[in-house]
Amino acid sequence: MNNVLYIAAGGAIGAVLRYSISILALQLFGTGFPFGTLIVNVAGSFLMGCIYALAELSHIGPEWKALIGVGLLGALTTFSTFSNETLLLLQQGELVKASLNVLLNLILCLTVVYLGQQLIYSRV
């Protein structure tokens, strides 16, 4: 039951962060491309790589993994919004933007989760 509370607390923080970052990205970049979602997914993926490497090395306990990895980063990152925004771009005839959105999210997120892990492993 304790993990549920950690996850809920982390989720509340992650959801507010996601909302705040999305609003800021809209103000900075406008509505032409879903930069807010890209930013939260890339940042969250990097942090996820760090958290899971720390957990694997036993430098953080399961409660921190639940709080940050499942709760905070689970609420911060968003596959459903990414999918919906990509579909909307396709429906608007924006094939290049939709393709770019898919490629950037997949390539950048996979790259930074790896880099996050390597950062932690290199410090040990």
Swiss-Prot record:
Gene: fluC
InterPro entries xrefs: FluC
UniProt activity-regulation remark: Na(+) is not transported, but it plays an essential structural role and its presence is essential for fluoride channel function.
Record-given protein name: Fluoride-specific ion channel FluC
Binding of Na(+), residues: G74, T77
Membrane topology, from the record: Multi-pass membrane protein
Signal peptide stretch: none
GO cellular component: plasma membrane
Protein family (similarity comment): Belongs to the fluoride channel Fluc/FEX (TC 1.A.43) family.
Coiled-coil region(s): none
Regions that span the bilayer: 4-24, 35-55, 60-80, 100-120
Catalyses which reaction(s): fluoride(in) = fluoride(out)
Biological process per Gene Ontology, one example term: cellular detoxification of fluoride
HAMAP family membership: FluC (MF_00454)
Cellular compartments annotated: Cell inner membrane
Superkingdom to which the source organism belongs: Bacteria
A molecular-function term among this protein's GO annotations: metal ion binding
Sorted UniProt keywords: Cell inner membrane, Cell membrane, Ion channel, Ion transport, Membrane, Metal-binding, Sodium, Transmembrane, Transmembrane helix, Transport
Free-text function comment from the UniProt entry: Fluoride-specific ion channel. Important for reducing fluoride concentration in the cell, thus reducing its toxicity.
